[in-house]
Amino acid sequence: MTKAFVLLNSETGQEDDNLLKIKDFLIVKEAFRTFGVYDIIILVEEEDMKQLKETIFHKIRMIDGVRATLTLLVL
């Protein structure tokens, strides 16, 4: 299994909606609102790196109101 933390920056006012959408994804193990540069921290787990990349690019980053993400792979 490949695990990563994804730090997500949302458009102002869309943080709560984005958090609810993110929590619906099966690969999301945990997700929390935060204060600071990033609005949400997400723990994701996928079968391999290819699937993780696909999920981040084609699901998480495609949510309306997502401005930027930073992915930190767990070693």
Task: State each model region's role.
Residues 1-75:
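A compositional/biophysical signature of low hydrophobicity enriched in polar/charged and small residues
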